[in-house]
Amino acid sequence: MRGLEESGPRPTATPCGCVKPALETGNLLTEPVGYLESCFSAKNGTPRQPSICSYSRACLRIRKRIFNNPEHSLMGLEQFSHVWILFVFHKNGHLSCKAKVQPPRLNGAKTGVFSTRSPHRPNAIGLTLAKLEKVEGGAIYLSGIDMIHGTPVLDIKPYIAEYDSPQNVMEPLADFNLQNNQHTPNTVSQSDSKTDSCDQRQLSGCDEPQPHHSTKRKPKCPEDRTSEENYLTHSDTARIQQAFPMHREIAVDFGLESRRDQSSSVAEEQIGPYCPEKSFSEKGTDKKLERVEGAAVLQGSRAETQPMAPHCPAGRADGAPRSVVPAWVTEAPVATLEVRFTPHAEMDLGQLSSQDVGQASFKYFQSAEEAKRAIEAVLSADPRSVYRRKLCQDRLFYFTVDIAHVTCWFGDGFAEVLRIKPASEPVHMTGPVGSLVSLGS
């Protein structure tokens, strides 16, 4: 009806007409907890997703203006392997936004802004899932980031797989007995767990061969918890933490497709996520994972195992909720590029890593090989905008990572690095003056 106003509390205005900050109305005046020190100094060449370049590193120091003892605010955070970083897209250049955007991954096609990670949003807030390398005093050290130097960070939250993964968030409707109006639990009783649980998983159809799945690794899942046996060995735990630093579905759902795992990411999305049920902390203390390795028969001090059949994730059955993403996320029209270096660029990179007196050395990378792999990861994802891909194909492309200023050009299916020289312009941090960020006004 005409004249019908939106429900909700009305924002109060000052005499000058400005909206007062208030929690009730959602009009907030935020203050960054810190400013990121990143290996990327500008937007050009910065990865659009954190998983593109695992070698990208950053440091975030909590400001004493927020807490007198910043180290107190980080107490206990070192027990987590990954953290959510909530930040501001401070280099947008303008506050305006559109309902439809053209993300580079769609190569010119339009879609709704809320179905993308576009920085141009009604509230210019970004979200990154980064690997926590270490906590040192009032600072945290991160890797696998997609934020530039000087980014205002609003908040830090630990990544908890049990809460942040979409699997098992809700139970399928079939689990409810509508006749008796009683809820039937998903778990199997202890007496039947060794037989019925495995049979039911095989009948669910999860053990059918997948078209793109690698034969080197089969999907496995933790066994229904019935006892404290069948723990993973140390080598298995290390292998899983290296291959699966987070749930694959949550990674795909947030656009975190790793270039190195493209051959298996599609198959894992079709099968379902690898589902460790405990913390992904690298230390792995007090929380171990269980899995089915077949029926283990203990005889004296020796355990004989029978051949293992493929299983689907624990607690999952036909009709169970799972994470779903559009096809353009997993099968983007933008192809992965081959990256190559000219001999001159290889020589330039070697000179940057030398420890000559008076020459700057890498601040975020530990070696020239790490810098090279980071450059390869950035270029293989084609960091150019849609405009540059279509109208500036003959132009050189420049970007800076750490202290390396990279010059390259793009051809048909490849990117070639022509020159690498020390970055000339120092990166300046945003000062505390004018650091307040207004959101929701």
Curated annotation (Swiss-Prot):
EC number(s) on file: 2.1.1.-
Top-level EC class: transferase
CDD domains documented for this protein: UPF0066 (cd09281)
UniProt xrefs under InterPro entries: TrmO-like_N, UPF0066_cons_site, YaeB-like, YaeB-like_sf, YaeB_N_sf
Disordered: annotated span: 179-231, 264-284
GO MF entries: tRNA (L-threonylcarbamoyladenosine(37)-C2) methyltransferase activity
Keyword Cell membrane listed: no
SUPFAM superfamilies listed in its UniProt record: YaeB-like
Domain of life: Eukaryota
A Pfam family assignment: TrmO_N
Keywords of the record: Methyltransferase, S-adenosyl-L-methionine, Transferase, tRNA processing
Residue spans of biased composition, Polar residues class: 179-192
Residues involved in S-adenosyl-L-methionine binding: 47-49, 90-91, 117, 127, 148-151
Reactions that this protein is recorded to catalyse: N(6)-L-threonylcarbamoyladenosine(37) in tRNA + S-adenosyl-L-methionine = N(6)-methyl,N(6)-L-threonylcarbamoyladenosine(37) in tRNA + S-adenosyl-L-homocysteine + H(+)
Record-stated family: Belongs to the tRNA methyltransferase O family.
The protein's role, per its UniProt record: S-adenosyl-L-methionine-dependent methyltransferase responsible for the addition of the methyl group in the formation of N6-methyl-N6-threonylcarbamoyladenosine at position 37 (m(6)t(6)A37) of the tRNA anticodon loop of tRNA(Ser)(GCU). The methyl group of m(6)t(6)A37 may improve the efficiency of the tRNA decoding ability.
PANTHER family attached to this UniProt entry: TRNA (ADENINE(37)-N6)-METHYLTRANSFERASE
Name recorded for this polypeptide: tRNA (adenine(37)-N6)-methyltransferase
Source organism of the structure: Homo sapiens
